[in-house]
From Swiss-Prot:
Gene source species: Fusarium heterosporum
Record's keyword terms, sorted: NADP, Nucleotide-binding, Oxidoreductase
Gene expressing this chain: fsdC
Functional summary from the UniProt entry: Trans-enoyl reductase; part of the gene cluster that mediates the biosynthesis of fusaridione A, a bright yellow trans-fused decalin-containing tetramic acid with antimicrobial activity. The PKS module of fsdS catalyzes the formation of the polyketide unit which is then conjugated to L-tyrosine by the condensation domain of the fsdS NRPS module. Activity of the Dieckmann cyclase domain (RED) results in release of the intermediate fusaridione A. The unstable pyrrolidinedione ring of fusaridione A is opened through a reverse-Dieckmann reaction to afford its ring-opened form.
Superkingdom of the organism of origin: Eukaryota
Protein name listed in UniProt: Trans-enoyl reductase fsdC
EC nos: 1.-.-.-
Length: 381
């Protein structure tokens, strides 16, 4: 740590505030840890949302790319090696896990070697959206991924609706669905993003702002004889969960549940398919519909108590699933690292310089000022 370790710190207030701090504590890698000189870190809505999920009081940020400076005795990496990864969120986690700082300690979990053909900015934006899309498609929805030899139900020519294709998770889901063999791949996006969505692999794109969007999608499905039972809500808007709302405000939002992305996406499904056969996943818990299952970007051995989701499984059953699901995510990530040049177009990125600009970037992302754009902090200033 040859320079001041400037960081963006998340502390708990009713507004989920961040502030810039210089971290004084030295980071010394132990066991399988690696000390990383951070080049870039990716900004995500979770940088703010997690305070409303009772997670705070730590250095913010999850996605990172950088250079190994020191290693613990069990680290799989070498000094000077380029790596990237994503860290686990939890309340009062150690400062050394935060991505939005000059240096961090990377655990072995969800950390990968970065080959020369994968540039650091792409690497620093890959795992939050990509991992969530993988968990949704391969684990929650239960499909295989033939290109990587991941078993599961055959996705070939299975219709899928990805609501919110222009966001980070949506773009990843569209591209992975294309590689897996889903068809048709139907998505929603603002009108200005329709051409890009088709370039990424969507076969049909609808404007989610249109008052007739649900009927338009159903008309397409009926005209083609396609039966839709698979939905990936990649935005989960209008649910009122983890948005920093008061209890009264949350109830008011939930009273308008039929206007939420989750409700509208489900309304597009074949009405003749029973609930038990629907495959629905979302990026936030859907309290009003237990048929939706919340997807994450990784499945650690210790289950994260995030709350808000209705589940019929016991904790032991959940843990068994998570142990089976995490290797599937990692195998798909490894496939994507090797094949990203053919199958992956990263989100449009804008680099901000240092934690000062990064702090404003976090606020802009949370306020929804980005459209099909990912902000990345350059810590080499």
């Amino acid at each position: 740590m040859d320079r001041p370790n400037k960081a963006i710190y998340l502390y708990q207030t009713s507004k989920g505030n961040h502030e810039i701090r210089t971290i004084q504590e030295p980071y010394v890698p132990k066991d399988a840890q690696s000390l990383v000189d951070v080049q870039y870190s990716g900004i995500n809505p979770a940088d703010t949302r997690h305070v409303y999920m009772d997670m705070s009081n730590y250095v913010a940020g999850y996605e990172f790319a950088g250079t190994v400076k020191q290693v613990g005795p069990k680290s799989p990496f070498k000094i000077g090696q380029e790596i990237f990864g994503i860290s686990i969120p939890y309340n009062n986690r150690p400062n050394y896990l935060g991505a939005h700082q000059s240096f961090l300690l990377a655990e072995n979990f969800m950390t990968f070697a970065r080959p020369d053909h994968l540039d650091p900015i792409t690497a620093a934006t890959l795992l939050a959206g990509g991992g969530t899309a993988m968990d949704g498609l391969l684990n929650v929805l239960g499909y295989g991924f033939p290109p990587a030899g991941i078993p599961g139900d055959d996705p070939t020519n299975v219709p899928i609706l990805i609501w919110g294709g222009a966001g980070g998770v949506g773009q990843a889901a569209v591209q992975l669905a294309k590689a897996a063999g889903f068809f048709p791949i139907i998505t929603t996006a603002s009108q200005q993003n329709h051409d890009v969505m088709k370039q990424l692999g969507a076969s049909h794109v609808f404007n989610y702002k249109s008052p007739s969007v649900v009927q338009d999608i159903r008309n397409l499905l009926e005209s083609k004889g396609w039966s839709l039972k698979t939905v990936f809500d990649a935005v989960s808007t209008g649910l009122g969960v983890f948005d920093g709302l008061t209890e009264e405000q949350e109830k008011a939002v939930q009273q308008k549940y039929n206007q939420s992305s989750s409700a509208m996406a489900r309304q597009c499904c074949d009405p003749n398919i029973p609930d038990s056969e629907l495959r629905l996943t979302s990026v936030l818990p859907v309290k009003m519909d237990p048929n939706y299952v919340f997807c994450l970007n990784f499945r650690p051995v210790e289950i994260l108590d995030i709350g808000g989701e209705v589940t019929k499984d016991t904790k032991e059953e959940e843990m068994t699933k998570w142990k089976e699901w995490q290797p599937r995510i990692e195998k798909c990530i490894e496939w994507l690292i090797e094949n990203h040049e053919k199958h992956w177009q990263p989100p449009r990125t804008r680099v901000v310089k240092g934690v000062e600009e990064g702090l404003q970037g976090i606020r802009d992302v949370w306020q929804g000022k980005m459209s099909r754009e990912k902000l990345v902090i350059d810590h080499r200033v």
